[in-house]
Amino acid sequence: MFMGEYRHTVDAKGRMIVPAKFREGLGEQFVLTRGLDQCLFGYPMNEWKLIEEKLKALPLTKKDARAFTRFFFSGATECELDKQGRVNIASSLLNYAKLEKECVVIGVSNRIELWSKVIWEQYTEEQEDSFAEIAENMIGFDI
């Protein structure tokens, strides 16, 4: 399981050090793809295969299913960590998430998310005020 928030940088070659606590969970190969809210999602291969099966089961006749599947898979790339624990992020993904120098890597249960520091700070500031309301609206979810 992935959890926590870490600050890192993306170098001029588009490489970022993956937090040590996430490396083992991601494994030797993992998938990075466009996520929601202008971040990137990173999945270990076993989790990616589960998502792949669910998305393949969506009806081809549904416009939203086709659109989401295209969005999700067309942005996906298989990644490996180098000996320094860095991942080379595709330029299309860097552009999508507006990852420049400073970034934030968070753990979200079965995946990691890579955020631009600026976008993450805006997102958390916006969500902070509505966190209690969001939790209240989650039907059947008790902590």
Swiss-Prot record:
Superkingdom of the source species: Bacteria
Main location: cytoplasm
Subcellular location: Cytoplasm, Nucleoid
GO cellular component: cytoplasm; nucleoid
Domain SpoVT-AbrB: 5-47, 76-119
GO biological process: negative regulation of DNA-templated transcription initiation
GO MF annotation: an example: transcription cis-regulatory region binding
InterPro entries, alphabetized: MraZ, MraZ_C, MraZ_dom, MraZ_N, MraZ_sf, SpoVT-AbrB_dom, SpoVT-AbrB_sf
Keywords: Cytoplasm, DNA-binding, Repeat, Transcription, Transcription regulation
Assembly and binders: Forms oligomers.
Family indicated by similarity: Belongs to the MraZ family.
Protein name: Transcriptional regulator MraZ
